[in-house]
Amino acid sequence: MSNLDSTHHFDVVIVGSGGAGLSLALSLPSHYKIAILAKSSLTEASTFYAQGGVAAVLDKTDSIQQHIDDTMIAGAHLCELDAVKQTVEGGRPSVNFLLKHGVEFTLDEDDQLHLTREGGHSQRRIIHAADATGKAISTTLVQRAKEASNLTIFENFIAIDIITLHKLGHIQQDNRAVGLYVLDEQNEKVHTFLAPFIALACGGAMKAYLYTSNPDIATGDGIAMAYRAGCRVANMEFNQFHPTCLYHPQARSFLITEAMRGEGAYLRLPDGERFMLRFDERAELAPRDIVARAIDYEIKRLGIRHVWLDITHKSAEFIQQHFPTLYTRLLELGIDITKDMIPVVPAAHYTCGGVVVNAQSQTDIEGLYAIGETSYTGLHGANRMASNSLLECFVYGLSAAEDIQQKFEQDFNLPNIPEWDDSQVTDADEDVVILQNWDELRSTMWNYVGIVRTTKRLQRALHRIEMLKREITEYYQDYRVSKNLIELRNLVLVSEMIVRCAMQRKESRGLHYTLDYPELEQQLKKTVLTPPNFEVKQIPVNTL
């Protein structure tokens, strides 16, 4: 990549190489010139690590309305109904899109798509590729992207900021995204990417927490960049903690799929008690927020480090057939899941809030789209239901593709854009400053803004985050950009969003549980942050 010019012109630039970004890229006409920016390797995206599957109404005993109802219940009724309908109705077209591109899903004995069940779903409606669905989808779509002659892939290219007309001084015009500044990590050079259409499909922000199931790329880049560009964000207080992350010193980010509980696994305490029956009549199949809170409660009550997930009452053949990846990986760690229970703890897993978008994935800024975990469509409400997230990626990726085609003009004139200027900065003198701030931020978020919150904890968190942000901002202004500095700058901004939204919500709903306000409020409101000064307000759901 060292011979690249520093300025690149494309029709569409997509930040992110997971399911959301690749579904958009592969749905656009083949004569569009498209860039895909991957922050790491192409498959290093949350999609790759998704074990569960894609929720879709395919069985004749199931219905669109049942899937809508299940989603609304899981989301504590804070979901935007139009978004839920659009997503659920897009289930079959999304599955057809994946099949068309060659994704091989698990079939049943009749050679039909095998459907499993996960927490919150009243029916079997999860299509999957054994217990490694994300890997099957990711590797297939990546291969199709590599085969497409109109797609140019840039690996290890990290977006820094969005270029808009207003940032360039064209205040009299309606604001519009026209490009990005991007760091080529290998050559330590900042490039300018220009395009009339830019899509942020770069995942969530759960690296804000000390313990997470997410890959290292999940630093909230898209959410932070969009906010700095002038886009509203919403519902950042709702962060999902997956109930069952493996507790093992050699595998800190290893997720134990929800499908294991869907297929009958029990959660147990050290004395063998199946404790979920005390918390919810659905037991292990209760929504994730309820299960995660129950585990957190028992860990704190008993002073233990983890609970146990037990599927040993199923036959070895059943376990190896349904969970081949898990069986093999855990065996390598000395755990035979046909005989041994699995030590599990909750871990930060999914960002339910994000950049506010419409049905076409369009943000507040013309030409700028946000798709997947980066976005707030309103689908998830106060809690995401299992396997709705991959579905959302494809539904809104295809929707964004349609919108771009309708607005596409080949003679679109981009203004003159200055190259990145780092003449006034120097190389960082001590990277230990970044490392220290990174660790302090993630510990603060885990201890004060975790599964159970209080007003005092949130106030303490905000105080520390504001101090860290000042320090990081000074560092960013004084020194040459690096991957770690870009990520830390984004993560501290998104962490502040999470805390400010959490402080605004005076109730316990879904994933936001506070001891100071344990009851539900009557009105259903979403929390919206408006840039640049964190103007925060709550407005009724199903309104703009």
Curated annotation (Swiss-Prot):
Specify the superkingdom.
Bacteria
The EC class name is oxidoreductase
So where does FAD get bound? 17-20, 39, 46-53, 221, 373, 389-390
| Keyword Protein biosynthesis found | no
Its pathway is:
Cofactor biosynthesis; NAD(+) biosynthesis; iminoaspartate from L-aspartate (oxidase route): step 1/1
Localisation per UniProt entry = Cytoplasm
Alphabetical list of SUPFAM superfamilies matching this protein: FAD/NAD(P)-binding domain, Succinate dehydrogenase/fumarate reductase flavoprotein C-terminal domain, Succinate dehydrogenase/fumarate reductase flavoprotein, catalytic domain
UniProt KW Cytoplasm keyword = yes
Record site feature (Important in orienting the L-aspartate substrate), residues: E118
Pfam families per UniProt: FAD_binding_2, Succ_DH_flav_C
Keywords, sorted A to Z: Cytoplasm, FAD, Flavoprotein, Nucleotide-binding, Oxidoreductase, Pyridine nucleotide biosynthesis
Gene Ontology annotations of biological process type: 'de novo' NAD biosynthetic process from L-aspartate
Which reaction(s) does its UniProt entry say it catalyses? L-aspartate + O2 = iminosuccinate + H2O2
Q: Which cofactor does it need?
A: FAD
Q: Name one GO molecular function term.
A: L-aspartate oxidase activity
Q: What is its main location?
A: cytoplasm
The catalytic activity of this protein is classed by the Enzyme Commission as 1.4.3.16
Family under the similarity heading:
Belongs to the FAD-dependent oxidoreductase 2 family. NadB subfamily.
What function does the entry list?
Catalyzes the oxidation of L-aspartate to iminoaspartate, the first step in the de novo biosynthesis of NAD(+).
Q: Which NCBIfam families match?
A: nadB, PRK09077.1
Q: What name is this protein filed under?
A: L-aspartate oxidase
Q: Which organism is it from?
A: Acinetobacter baylyi (strain ATCC 33305 / BD413 / ADP1)
